[in-house]
């Protein structure tokens, strides 16, 4: 936490993106702070973004903008697949992704693999808007390393969602060749995976490497998509979808529209589903094309 010398009653949290760029938010209260066996965990209450989960001094999610991230990482792959029943979620200890996944009536089981149980405990206590479905009867919580899990499990999934932090520390292996090969192995023959893939402005080389590794793993369709994320570096973020069979641009929009009558969303709808791919910026499309040549 950084104290503002001019206004001593004001507390600010600052995340430094690099030596020249930072994001600061004014803090109402520090609700939770603990160092687990893996990372430093903080939950703060902010004036403009509500409660925020911070891991190792890095924003993970805030109440104000989390719906953008969690809806897009979940509903894009789950509606691209015509009948997703068995889903694996790796990471996302705040519970926001699981909350969105269980909204799908076709989903029967959600294996939720999280490395740090302390994150789940903190979010269940202080961020119930996100963690509200972790105890859903469809959800099977597994406390282990996601890298190890996909390497060892014999289970097969229709959709795998990798809700991972930045590629540093224990999470670095979630962006390496061997991990993608194991994810491919864990998917059914028509399976789909999606992964958090950083900022196209700051991390274009990383996105290209992800695309290469996914191609080498055997995926036929590889498509990054972008979206605004105010509390992430640059405010411009991405996911990368990889599919063995189904193309997200070929979904039945009427099916999505009908399903959404019984599903509350704030950002995602049938038009966003296709538009988010069609509106991909040229520099990103060019970079992906080059990576896949």
UniProtKB/Swiss-Prot annotation:
<dbReference type="InterPro" id="IPR030374">
    <property type="entry name" value="PABS"/>
</dbReference>
<dbReference type="Pfam" id="PF01564">
    <property type="entry name" value="Spermine_synth"/>
</dbReference>
<dbReference type="GO" id="GO:0004766">
    <property type="term" value="F:spermidine synthase activity"/>
</dbReference>
<feature type="binding site">
    <location>
        <begin position="163"/>
        <end position="166"/>
    </location>
    <ligand>
        <name>spermidine</name>
    </ligand>
</feature>
<feature type="binding site">
    <location>
        <position position="94"/>
    </location>
    <ligand>
        <name>spermidine</name>
    </ligand>
</feature>
<feature type="domain" description="PABS">
    <location>
        <begin position="10"/>
        <end position="244"/>
    </location>
</feature>
<feature type="active site" description="Proton acceptor">
    <location>
        <position position="163"/>
    </location>
</feature>
<keyword id="KW-0745">Spermidine biosynthesis</keyword>
<comment type="pathway">
    <text>Amine and polyamine biosynthesis; spermidine biosynthesis; spermidine from putrescine: step 1/1.</text>
</comment>
<feature type="binding site">
    <location>
        <position position="114"/>
    </location>
    <ligand>
        <name>S-methyl-5'-thioadenosine</name>
    </ligand>
</feature>
<feature type="binding site">
    <location>
        <position position="170"/>
    </location>
    <ligand>
        <name>S-methyl-5'-thioadenosine</name>
    </ligand>
</feature>
<keyword id="KW-0808">Transferase</keyword>
<feature type="binding site">
    <location>
        <position position="39"/>
    </location>
    <ligand>
        <name>S-methyl-5'-thioadenosine</name>
    </ligand>
</feature>
<keyword id="KW-0963">Cytoplasm</keyword>
<dbReference type="InterPro" id="IPR035246">
    <property type="entry name" value="Spermidine_synt_N"/>
</dbReference>
<comment type="subunit">
    <text>Homodimer or homotetramer.</text>
</comment>
<feature type="binding site">
    <location>
        <begin position="145"/>
        <end position="146"/>
    </location>
    <ligand>
        <name>S-methyl-5'-thioadenosine</name>
    </ligand>
</feature>
<comment type="function">
    <text>Catalyzes the irreversible transfer of a propylamine group from the amino donor S-adenosylmethioninamine (decarboxy-AdoMet) to putrescine (1,4-diaminobutane) to yield spermidine.</text>
</comment>
<dbReference type="InterPro" id="IPR030373">
    <property type="entry name" value="PABS_CS"/>
</dbReference>
<dbReference type="GO" id="GO:0008295">
    <property type="term" value="P:spermidine biosynthetic process"/>
</dbReference>
<dbReference type="InterPro" id="IPR001045">
    <property type="entry name" value="Spermi_synthase"/>
</dbReference>
<feature type="binding site">
    <location>
        <position position="70"/>
    </location>
    <ligand>
        <name>spermidine</name>
    </ligand>
</feature>
<keyword id="KW-0620">Polyamine biosynthesis</keyword>
<dbReference type="Pfam" id="PF17284">
    <property type="entry name" value="Spermine_synt_N"/>
</dbReference>
<dbReference type="InterPro" id="IPR037163">
    <property type="entry name" value="Spermidine_synt_N_sf"/>
</dbReference>
<protein>
    <recommendedName>
        <fullName>Polyamine aminopropyltransferase</fullName>
        <ecNumber>2.5.1.16</ecNumber>
    </recommendedName>
</protein>
<comment type="similarity">
    <text>Belongs to the spermidine/spermine synthase family.</text>
</comment>
<dbReference type="GO" id="GO:0005737">
    <property type="term" value="C:cytoplasm"/>
</dbReference>
<dbReference type="InterPro" id="IPR029063">
    <property type="entry name" value="SAM-dependent_MTases_sf"/>
</dbReference>
